[in-house]
């Protein structure tokens, strides 16, 4: 009987303790805070399971020179502010949590960005975004072809890319807004 009473009290106290933890601002909510235990697990395991289930194995858009160039223009406009350009990492990405990966820099085993992922996986991330990461979904911003073009660009980041595409990817972004003109 004591066990059941203890169990019942524990079942009542646990949600109250969780509510108090949340109510008094204890969870890590600032980007500089340490992650919660199992935070990466909570996001990455189900995300990869869903991607595996929904992955398009044969991309409808190939990595032609034209598609790579269009993908580079899209990347510069929609992605580079967070993910950087070739040789020009995005400085404010360091203030994000998790930090946005720089997609033109080599990482483990010399892989550049996400070029070790199939284009369909990158497409899924571009289209749907990634919760708890700051990565938005672009389904309402880009059309299907555009999402595939930028996905093919990133999937081929570790391969020879046409020189005009590479030239575009090396140009710095102009992120300084034009000065506002006074209105009367």
Give, region by region, the residue ranges found by the protein language model.
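Periplasmic c-type cytochrome electron-transfer domains
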Residues: 2-69, 113-119, 138-153, 171-184
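Gly/Gly-Pro-rich "capping" loops immediately C-terminal to redox-active cysteine motifs
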Residues: 68, 72, 84-124, 138
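Short alpha-helix boundary/capping motifs
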Residues: 99, 107-110, 150-154, 163, ...
């Amino acid at each position: 009987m004591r066990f059941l009473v203890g169990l019942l009290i524990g079942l009542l106290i646990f949600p109250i303790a969780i509510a108090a933890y949340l109510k008094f601002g204890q969870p890590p909510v600032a980007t500089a805070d340490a992650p919660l235990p199992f935070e990466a697990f909570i996001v990455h395991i189900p995300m990869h399971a869903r991607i595996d289930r929904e992955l398009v194995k044969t991309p409808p858009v190939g990595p032609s020179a034209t598609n790579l160039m269009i993908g580079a223009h899209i990347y510069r406009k929609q992605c580079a502010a967070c993910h950087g350009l070739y040789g020009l990492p995005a400085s404010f990405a360091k203030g994000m949590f998790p930090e946005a990966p720089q997609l033109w820099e080599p990482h483990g085993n010399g892989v550049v960005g996400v070029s070790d992922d199939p284009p369909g996986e990158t497409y899924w991330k571009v289209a749907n975004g990634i919760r708890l990461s700051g990565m938005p979904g672009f389904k309402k911003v880009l059309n299907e072809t555009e999402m595939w073009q930028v996905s093919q660009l990133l999937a081929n980041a570790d391969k020879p890319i046409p020189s005009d595409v590479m030239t575009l990817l090396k140009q710095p972004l102009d992120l300084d807004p034009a000065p506002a003109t006074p209105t009367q």
